[in-house]
């Protein structure tokens, strides 16, 4: 095919899903001339699976994206149809916001946001190859012969990468939702020497709302006072749509059991590795055969559609089996299926081939982000996309990459896990993966990351000033409570008795009283007068910082210890073969991962403390061998 020069840019982003839109917006807003290429302009920021944003760990990622200057939180606040704070009965480390989004409004709003950015060109096109010169990525070539040149390229092709949809015995080449897949780019990456692996994910059927008998289900309303994802959002929509809870039963399970031989999950037709934490209904009834029922949530996909997402019923069973099992579920006896559930297999680049900046080790100037890196979920994709876009733009401007630490953000945990440990299955972010999760809370994402967002140019001066004012207000209120003494008056004793807290024998500082588990900031406010108004947001922050002060200090000490290890950098020219005493597995892993610090090396699977000690001695003695040839 004849090719032609279609233009030159600073950054090219391939794909416009949740990773791609964050990468493109970050790059463009930082001043880089950015081209975003996507197979179908009608699919920008499309939600091919669950129409929701947030949840445990993931909701914190959305807040972090917002604190750094990304778009997912703002877009969700504009387009949600339900908002709920999860785990409110637990500690602040595991609380998380989750929204049901209006699927169609979400993508239209995001596309409009991109179109308004003056530094971004949004264009429809299918990328088949990269332009590589002397190991450096210089651009992309589309299937129509257009050559676009750039200083850096970010690939965010997600499940479109050589995608194949599977429904029972039916298998065909496709991206999600029957879109055109990206086949030749995967083949080209293999030609370049990248290690790819087949992963799998799935989605449940969609059913028609008017054919559901909601009287047989349990209503799940949103919060009366919904919280925002974005620190920029001032007003929240109060009108929300409910979700509905129902359950599978023994009849459902019998139908599935009788058709397991037709499920790709249990036959040789499935080649990809599936997500452990998002199992299909077939997988659930086999793995948890003792359970008589499983939860099913009926979630509306938007305000102006009849489609309802059947959460908990992800499946790739044949179409007629899906219809039969749906109709065994209470409330769905006469349901009409609008879209069939399916599994999709796709290519993933093994992420240990990346630097922590998300630039590939094999090709300079080439970055990858999102599900192509082996992750699952919109939020994980968006977090990677944001960081890849930031670092692609910074490379153009000859600046050092931004690498978030495990103590700074869940995004930092996510990327470090990927590039240091790799993944054998679609990676899902969990609170248990973060060793400093008390520091990485939903409520303090702005306190952790706004400074960085402002420094790199994604947070405006106006927003930064508001952030500084909030910081000052928090410190002022903490100081006031640490100086204010509460006397054991009749009013105070009555309040304490009412909530089952021990009465005071002597006066006590307000901050010390607040440390009691049963005492809230609101209770303190009832007995301690205030000269200035304190917002709910500031009150929450003051209460958490005072109440959990001891635990937070302990976590900070652990962070300091870890940072001393992070500060011990491993020289770029180190020759691991020259280090005697390293275990064979450790030697192989260190050569493959190429860790940047002793701390990162210590997190590599197969590298044990003895290997780290040998490595430390080698570096500290200055025995850095000549560069390997």
From Swiss-Prot:
This is tRNA uridine 5-carboxymethylaminomethyl modification enzyme MnmG. NAD(+) binds at residues 274-288. It comes from Listeria innocua serovar 6a (strain ATCC BAA-680 / CLIP 11262). Transmembrane segments: none annotated. The keyword ATP-binding does not apply. Coiled coil: none annotated. One of its GO terms (biological process) is tRNA wobble uridine modification. It is found in: Cytoplasm. The gene is mnmG. FAD binds at residues 15-20, 127, 182, 371. HAMAP family: MnmG_GidA.
